[in-house]
């Protein structure tokens, strides 16, 4: 059996797959996604020699390094396999380094039905249930550290979050898991909250099945209704995603204008709530720039995480704004702004859901959900 190790950059083979390279009885092929290079390590070659052969492929930091796509990777995999038995090792689709996560997803799609094992890799937010754990002995760890110190010094010094090498990214135990197509896609989408890839699957944050999310949403609806009953006028929900909150509000009797700029999310929102809510494509910035959608209140529920200027609220055509955020983000962003602004006052603050640990992606991983605090802002005469 040929071991095919598909990585973004050459150093990844030593950092995340040293235990694979150490299986000297197997022929091992390393595929570098950023350059398309293929390194063949014959069976019987000791680990030290294999690392020496890998070292010249280590490149300078390149922020443009990216997966070449499943089609290009499939060609490399087929060349390496040569029609014989092979297994593929690659990055986790949920690797926090998105360049690696994308390559891991693409490589699995390129495997052609061969067995695939994903390295857990860099995962500061998720704890994984792995299928194969390989603790390195002291000699293995020493070999990994020596490779980094000799050939990756620039990666120890770089400011690039995608490519920097730190203690937590140099694993003494290499952990791997197998995943089917749906699980891979859900893992990839879960870590994509800041980009368009979050919409590649339905319900990426598992609102429909999460007890934590159900409690948060139900409590949020009750909180809104306690201050702004359904007959108060329409609500404008900004960043409605697929409508988990929208449908609850409609069921409570509210008239809802739900806005969602992501086309895929908006399509699902319309399918789920379009018969009962009015759907709009504007972002918060667009709503503030052209305040043509008045409401009894605006809802900014779990969406001020992406660097938006809180000053945009000044231009929204409503005197009440409901905001919900996790406690740390609330303390770091909204609270200081609220202390400075003369235009808004805090009319209410209450916990909506307590922090909890929860399994995700069918139990493949779990994470800490940090709780949510609701803050009602009322416009002042300032």
Can you annotate each of these PLM segments?
Residues 1-116:
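Active-site beta-strand->loop->alpha-helix modules in alpha/beta enzyme cores, enriched
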Residues 2, 43-54, 65-71, 113-195:
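The feature marks non-catalytic terminal segments
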Residues 200-215:
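Class I SAM-dependent methyltransferase Rossmann-like catalytic core
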Residues 212-230:
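Conserved alpha-helix/loop element of class I SAM-dependent methyltransferases that forms part
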Residues 232-241:
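Conserved class I S-adenosyl-L-methionine
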Residues 242-252:
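Conserved SAM-binding loop of SAM-dependent methyltransferases across substrates and taxa
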Residues 252-276:
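Class I SAM-dependent methyltransferase SAM/SAH-binding core
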Residues 318-330:
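Conserved beta-strand signature within the Rossmann-like core of class I S-adenosyl-L-methionine
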């Amino acid at each position: 059996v040929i071991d095919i190790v598909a990585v973004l950059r050459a150093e990844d083979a030593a950092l995340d797959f040293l235990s694979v390279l150490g299986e000297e009885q197997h022929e091992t092929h390393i595929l570098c996604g950023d350059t398309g290079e293929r390194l063949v390590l014959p069976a019987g070659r000791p680990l030290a020699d294999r690392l020496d052969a890998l070292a010249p492929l280590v490149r300078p930091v390149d922020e443009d390094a990216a997966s070449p796509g499943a089609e290009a990777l499939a060609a490399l995999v087929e060349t390496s396999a040569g029609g014989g038995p092979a297994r593929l090792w690659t990055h986790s689709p949920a690797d926090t380094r998105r360049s690696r996560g994308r390559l891991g997803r693409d490589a699995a799609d390129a495997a052609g039905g061969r067995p695939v094992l994903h390295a857990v890799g860099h995962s500061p937010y998720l704890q994984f249930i792995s299928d194969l754990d390989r603790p390195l002995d002291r000699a293995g760890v020493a070999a990994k550290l020596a490779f980094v110190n000799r050939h990756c010094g620039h990666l120890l010094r770089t400011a690039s979050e995608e490519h920097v090498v730190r203690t937590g990214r140099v694993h003494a135990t290499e952990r791997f898991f197998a995943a089917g197509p749906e699980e891979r896609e859900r893992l990839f989408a879960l870590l994509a909250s800041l980009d368009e890839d979050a919409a590649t699957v339905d319900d990426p944050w598992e609102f429909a099945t999460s007890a934590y999310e159900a409690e948060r949403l139900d409590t949020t609806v009750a909180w809104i209704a306690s201050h702004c009953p359904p007959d108060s006028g329409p609500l404008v929900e900004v960043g409605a995603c697929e409508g988990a909150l929208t449908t609850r509000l409609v069921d409570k009797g509210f008239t809802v204008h739900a806005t969602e700029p992501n086309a895929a999310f908006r399509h699902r929102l319309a399918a789920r709530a379009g018969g009962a809510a009015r759907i709009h494509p504007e972002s918060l910035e667009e709503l503030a720039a052209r305040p043509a959608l008045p409401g009894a209140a605006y809802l900014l529920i779990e969406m001020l995480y992406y660097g938006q200027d809180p000053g945009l609220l000044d231009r929204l055509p409503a005197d009440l704004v409901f905001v919900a955020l996790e406690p740390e983000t609330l303390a770091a962003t909204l609270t200081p702004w609220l202390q400075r602004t003369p235009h808004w006052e805090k009319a209410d603050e209450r916990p909506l859901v307590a922090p909890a640990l929860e399994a995700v992606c069918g139990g493949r991983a779990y994470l800490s959900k940090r709780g949510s605090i609701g803050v009602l802002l009322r416009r002042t005469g300032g």
